[in-house]
Amino acid sequence: MGSFSIWHWLIVLVIVMLVFGTKKLRNIGQDLGGAVKGFKDGMKEGNTDEPATPTPAKELRDSTTIDVEAKEKSRQQ
């Protein structure tokens, strides 16, 4: 009772084809296939074998310079 046989699925398929039509189902299939292909292409672009080149770190300023500039700006206001 809980399991559907192949005949149940065929009847459901026939009803769906009658409701939506074969053209609409074909368009849905093409859209779904295009979405899957786009997803796979996106995954391939993200998995490149090229090692990521680290960006050179900028030289850090002395932290007192920022504090001095902030104090000077607050005095001017």
UniProtKB/Swiss-Prot annotation:
Pfam families: TatA_B_E. The chain crosses the membrane at residues 1-21. It is found in: Cell inner membrane. GO terms for biological process: protein transport by the Tat complex. Gene3D superfamilies: 1.20.5.3310. Residues 58-77 have a biased composition (Basic and acidic residues). Residues 40-77 are annotated as: Disordered. Its main location: membrane. The keyword Transmembrane applies. It is a single-pass membrane protein. One of its GO terms (molecular function) is protein transmembrane transporter activity. Keywords: Cell inner membrane, Cell membrane, Membrane, Protein transport, Translocation, Transmembrane, Transmembrane helix, Transport. It comes from the Bacteria. GO terms for cellular component: TAT protein transport complex. InterPro entries: TatA/B/E, TatA/E. HAMAP family: TatA_E. Part of the twin-arginine translocation (Tat) system that transports large folded proteins containing a characteristic twin-arginine motif in their signal peptide across membranes. TatA could form the protein-conducting channel of the Tat system. Belongs to the TatA/E family. The Tat system comprises two distinct complexes: a TatABC complex, containing multiple copies of TatA, TatB and TatC subunits, and a separate TatA complex, containing only TatA subunits. Substrates initially bind to the TatABC complex, which probably triggers association of the separate TatA complex to form the active translocon. This is Sec-independent protein translocase protein TatA. It comes from Cupriavidus metallidurans (strain ATCC 43123 / DSM 2839 / NBRC 102507 / CH34).
